[in-house]
Every structure is written in C-alpha cells, then in structure tokens.
Swiss-Prot record:
Subcellular location(s) per record: Cytoplasm
Entry annotated with the keyword Transcription: yes
Recorded GO MF terms: DNA binding
The keyword Transcription regulation is assigned to this record: yes
InterPro entries: Integrase-like_N (IPR017856), TACO1_YebC-like_2nd/3rd_dom (IPR048300), TACO1_YebC_N (IPR049083), Transcrip_reg_TACO1-like (IPR002876), Transcrip_reg_TACO1-like_dom3 (IPR026564), YebC-like (IPR029072)
UniProt record similarity statement: Belongs to the TACO1 family.
NCBIfam families: PRK00110.1, PRK12378.1, YebC/PmpR family DNA-binding transcriptional regulator
Pfam families membership: TACO1_YebC_N, Transcrip_reg
Keywords: Cytoplasm, DNA-binding, Transcription, Transcription regulation
Cross-referenced Gene3D superfamilies: 1.10.10.200, 3.30.70.980
Protein name (database record): Probable transcriptional regulatory protein Msil_2305
Organism of provenance: Methylocella silvestris (strain DSM 15510 / CIP 108128 / LMG 27833 / NCIMB 13906 / BL2)
Length: 248
C-alpha cells in the first residue's frame, strides 16, 4: 500500500475521531459550497457537486449540513475560495502535491511552506513534481456490490482504464475526460459509489527507511490538519514497523 492511503488508515485507527470528524465535515462542506457555486446547485446536474455530496454521505455528514453548504453558495455573504495547488519535496526526496481551497492565498502558502520547512523539506514551484504523477479519475465501490470479474467487465465496457479489486473494495481508474461517464454507467449497474474524484496517482513510489518515513508522515499529518487543505498526494511507501509505531 502506497503513500496517502497508508496515512489515511493510520488516522482512522487513532483515538481522535471527534476532532478529526469535525475538521473533515468542515472540509467537505467547503468543497460542496465551492462546487455548488461553480455550477448548478443540483447534484444531478453538477458532476463535481454530486461527487462532493457522495463523499459527505460516505462520512455520515448530516443531511442538514449538506443542504446548508449548498445553500451557502447562493447567499449574499458567500465566501470566495480559490483553488490552489502546491508542490514540493519532503524528506527523502518524496514528491508531494497539496490541493487547497483558500480565502487567503498568502496565509495558506505561508503555512504550507512552514510545514515543509519543519521536516527538512521544501515548497517548490507549481509543476515541479506533478510530472511524476498521473492526473486521473478514481471511482470507488464497496466489495459487496459485485465480483472482481463483474466490475472489471462493466468498467472496461464503460470506458475505464483499469480496475483494482480487493477485500476493501473496487477501485476504478479512468482518464480525466471519462470520469463522469464511467461513474454514471457503473452507478446504474452497481448503485452509488462511495467516492468519485480526480486524483494525482504517483507513477512510481519511493521506499523509505523508518526515520525518513516518520518525517514524511509527520509532514502529511501537518498538511492534512490545515483547514484549507483538501487533498494531499505523495509518492512514498513506508514499512509496517513505522505504521505500527504510529498506530500505537
């Protein structure tokens, strides 16, 4: 298991669930509001908003919170958020991409830069590391919706590029352009996905020693904890020993 997914598993196993959930709801609400403001306020007519609402439902975000976030987009006092991508190098030369929604670019850039500096990394220019990743679509379904063979057949027929199936579920990968069409086709067959989004998938990963691995995970923890940061992607792998230490 590589990079970001390792860190996510650690966070879910730690005992700070209430604080994590509160911060998560805030980030989900921000994405819903931005998506609704950029397009129509109807999830059925706005692919990005639909994906944001699905992500919120998966995390058991209350329906009232979701509706309030959508309505906020059309309010006179609606905040304006800029979509910003930061790129940099973490310990061990790990490439890191950070996606944020911010109402103050200078504040967010300063905070992101400080996190990289704390662990001996460096914030770089946009484009410095993104060439090491593929910007693609990813659709996720629980394992129970169908067999690996059924998902693979349906996904390829719908125009997907790859399918990864396992005990945790099915992960369907698509081109940027085909994400919406494939998601709709698979939803018609298997029901609503648990997530449908654009991601940065590393082309290759770096295996880190334990000390460097801990520093990289610390960096990702700092980034994830920032209110403006929506997603973090990195091209690393760490040992089970490091994961066990952090989960303790």
């Amino acid at each position: 298991m590589a990079g970001h997914s390792q860190f996510k598993n650690i966070m879910h196993k730690k005992g700070k669930q209430d604080a994590i959930r509160s911060k998560l709801f805030s980030k989900l609400a921000r994405e819903i509001t931005v998506a609704a403001k950029l397009g129509l306020p109807d999830p059925n007519m706005n692919a990005r908003l639909r994906a944001a609402v699905i992500a919120a439902r998966v995390e058991n975000m209350p329906k009232d919170n979701i509706e309030r976030a959508i309505k906020k987009a059309s309010g006179a006092d609606a905040e304006n958020y800029d979509e910003v991508r930061y790129e940099g190098y973490g310990p061990g030369g790990v490439a890191v991409i950070v996606e944020a929604l911010t109402d103050n670019r200078n504040r967010t850039a300063g905070e992101i830069r400080s996190y990289f500096t704390k662990v001996g990394g460096a914030l770089a220019e946009t484009g410095a590391v993104s060439f090491m990743f593929d910007h693609i679509g990813r659709i996720e379904f629980p394992a129970k919706v169908g067999s690996e063979e059924a998902m693979l057949e349906a996904a390829i027929e719908a125009g997907a590029e790859d399918v990864l199936s396992g005990e945790e579920g099915h992960e369907v990968l698509t081109s940027l352009e085909m994400l919406r069409d494939v998601a709709l086709a698979l939803e018609a067959k298997f029901g609503e996905p648990t997530r449908a989004s654009l991601i940065w998938k590393p082309q290759n990963t770096i295996s880190l020693d334990d000390e460097t691995g801990e520093k990289v995970l610390r960096l990702i923890g700092l980034l994830e904890d920032n209110d403006d940061v929506q997603n973090v992607y990195a091209n690393y792998e760490v040992s089970e020993a490091v994961l066990a230490k952090l989960e303790a």
